[in-house]
Amino acid sequence: MAYKKRRYKGPNKYHARKAVVDGITFDSRKEAERYMVLKEKAEKGQISGLQRQVKFILIPAQREPDQIGPRGGKKPGKLLERECAYIADFVYTENGQQVVEDTKGMRLSDYIIKRKLMLWVHGIKIKEI
């Protein structure tokens, strides 16, 4: 039986420390603190429909055309490129408007591209905290 060698995970590259609130693990303390603020607003009725880690598809997966299998059934084509998705930290409704929120420490280039694609594809402007 082969065992996988486990690699030691050192400290986070951007010094973010994971935090646990209400049994939920957050990627940073800043995100956990924002969750507590939003949870309090939801309890007061200022916002509704608070969700975490909501996935938005920006570019769907790219596949080769469907093929006919040996028994005549349709078989999905070979995957060429995986989908490109943006995962929002928080999504909620405030004053009848959907708000998509992201807590950011460092604004990396891939995030900036995904932010622009969110506006282009879904017409949603991300609120950065």
What are these regions (language model features)?
Residues M1-I129:
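Electrostatic, structured charged patches in enzyme active sites and in nucleic-acid/phosphate-binding
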